[in-house]
């Protein structure tokens, strides 16, 4: 029975991945570039020396500096490597509107030889979480569908992953959270959604165009499922302010109630 269950899960994973490959089709014929190395589940090193951080996905971290790999980190790396190999070691790239990150890596969407999006394939198998960081949000809708498919089927990280309570925030890094909005503040620095526990979600002014601003004050009392990178403000937050901050630049990262 257990073997049958595993076999069934395997075919569900393959079926979901095949569906997801059609979620974000290539915008046209792309020049293909060689991949020298799959660094991890969301980073490639090209033969021309560039490092490429895939847009729209955050995969589990590999072990380094004495830390163990996060669950499914190795699986994500292996799956991305397999997708690249199936594309004869070459990918097409569509750079984001913001083309570099703070580490100097190229920010881009990657496609195989058939024009199928690699991020959506990984998301549909539950090998990463969707992220939406303005201005690189062109494929948010199809990436969300791919993730939702994996979540509903409990694939990959979604077998055990559940949102952590905002009351339980204790360390930085990427997190999927859940909690109630206690209060919404607005000032020159943006909108501040004060959550249960030691967390505030910050929407900066430059991101306002992506949000329905009239709806933000009405989120007080609602439960959200925000995700993103937690910043420790200890020593910088004022008296009575939350220690932890999560900066959001697109509504998809808020986990708004449906």
Q: Where are the regions a protein language model picked out?
A:
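Positively charged N-terminal leader segments that act as targeting/secretion signals
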Residues: 1-10
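Small beta-barrel nucleic-acid-binding modules, primarily SNase/OB-fold domains
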Residues: 18-258
């Amino acid at each position: 029975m257990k073997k049958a269950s595993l076999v069934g899960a395997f075919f569900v994973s393959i079926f979901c991945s095949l569906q997801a490959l059609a979620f974000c089709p290539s915008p046209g014929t792309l020049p293909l570039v060689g991949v020298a190395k799959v660094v991890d589940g969301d980073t490639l090193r090209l033969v021309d020396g560039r490092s490429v951080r895939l847009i729209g996905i955050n995969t589990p971290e590999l072990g380094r500096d004495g830390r163990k790999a996060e669950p499914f980190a190795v699986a994500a790396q292996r799956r991305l490597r397999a997708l690249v190999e199936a594309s004869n070691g070459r990918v097409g790239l569509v750079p984001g509107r913001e083309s570099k990150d703070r580490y100097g890596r190229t920010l881009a969407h990657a496609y195989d030889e058939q024009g199928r999006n690699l991020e959506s394939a990984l998301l549909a198998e539950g090998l990463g979480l969707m992220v939406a960081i303005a201005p690189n949000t062109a494929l948010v809708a199809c990436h969300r569908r791919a993730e939702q498919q994996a979540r509903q089927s409990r694939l990959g990280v979604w077998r055990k992953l559940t949102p952590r309570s905002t009351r339980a925030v204790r360390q930085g890094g990427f997190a999927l959270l859940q909690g109630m909005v206690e209060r919404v503040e607005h000032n020159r620095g943006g909108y501040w959604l004060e959550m249960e526990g030691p967390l505030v979600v910050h929407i900066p002014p430059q991101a306002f165009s992506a949000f329905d601003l009239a709806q933000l004050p009405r989120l007080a009392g609602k439960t959200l499922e925000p995700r993103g990178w937690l910043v420790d403000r200890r020593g910088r937050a004022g008296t009575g302010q939350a220690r932890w901050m999560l900066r959001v630049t697109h509504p998809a990262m808020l986990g708004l109630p449906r």
